[in-house]
Amino acid sequence: MAAVVENVVKLLGEQYYKDAMEQCHNYNARLCAERSVRLPFLDSQTGVAQSNCYIWMEKRHRGPGLASGQLYSYPARRWRKKRRAHPPEDPRLSFPSIKPDTDQTLKKEGLISQDGSSLEALLRTDPLEKRGAPDPRVDDDSLGEFPVSNSRARKRIIEPDDFLDDLDDEDYEEDTPKRRGKGKSKSKGVSSARKKLDASILEDRDKPYACDICGKRYKNRPGLSYHYAHSHLAEEEGEDKEDSRPPTPVSQRSEEQKSKKGPDGLALPNNYCDFCLGDSKINKKTGQPEELVSCSDCGRSGHPSCLQFTPVMMAAVKTYRWQCIECKCCNLCGTSENDDQLLFCDDCDRGYHMYCLTPSMSEPPEGSWSCHLCLDLLKEKASIYQNQNSS
């Protein structure tokens, strides 16, 4: 060992070696001081809760070795019990005093023995006070080391089980555990029923639109319209082909929903514009006759000029089931969720989720945008190319 130290001293220098040893000593001293201050603590490496101890000694405690092979010896520290503080003078932690009239009645009934053990008789007759009565022998140090977080833990700490050792085990087991078990089972049943009720209320609040046929719920009306069109409409058409008899009505609301749809499955269009309140004969904004464009899901109508449609868009909306802005859903996934992520084509007014596109988009592009269908159909005449040429 000495040879190794001499080699290090020769290689690095004596002053460098002394500085390194001093820094190592300072680091160990700080580490030991920090450990002694933060005890008790939970060791993250071993998972053991370290408790305070007296294995840390100082230089002034060091003495010569007493046995052979000992370099140093340290004095043994005498163990001392922690001094307890006086119990708090809280009237709630004391036993209730027996009034004279109560004492007389208990003596008449023979509940109090002649030796004067009134406390035992009181605990025998009233098991409720047996639960709430405090235990004056509870160690105050244990209360300080384990802070009480709720009333149940506080009751568990001050429970007078030590005073009930002289009582019969049968009486003690009949009173407390069975009543507690019943209370727990009843509270569990009530809490589970309340949780189910709260969950159903939240579901009804989050998804107010329900299907009258199958009971499936949706967050908005476009989703319910899409469900009607793609689920029950196809079933109705298949039933009409197989059987000419009219189906039995499920409810009055379902009949109204079916009556609002035309023979082709589209919603019956309104005969007026939702923006200018004109009809196909006159546009109240321009004063000219103009054809109405109707939503295939809700039947709302509007003039193309009121909708700010371009001539290309006016021709494109006649080739597919056009949807208004409130009923618009993604043309790829077919859902209307995350409507803030919908991107509309400037040539056909179809909607697409930005994350459904290939490649996906994180932000909407600047200027005009054309979908893949319009790019294949219009090619160089698409709005996206017109915007690039104008810029």
From Swiss-Prot:
Keywords: Acetylation, Apoptosis, Chromatin regulator, Cytoplasm, Isopeptide bond, Metal-binding, Nucleus, Phosphoprotein, Repeat, Transcription, Transcription regulation, Ubl conjugation, Zinc, Zinc-finger. The modification N-acetylalanine is found at residue 2. GO terms for molecular function: histone H3K14ac reader activity; histone H4K16ac reader activity; zinc ion binding. PROSITE patterns: ZF_PHD_1 (PS01359), ZF_PHD_2 (PS50016), ZINC_FINGER_C2H2_1 (PS00028), ZINC_FINGER_C2H2_2 (PS50157). Residues 100-110, 126-140, 253-263 have a biased composition (Basic and acidic residues). Residues 79-147, 165-199, 233-266 are annotated as: Disordered. It is found in: Nucleus; Cytoplasm. This is Zinc finger protein ubi-d4. It comes from Mus musculus. The gene is Dpf2.
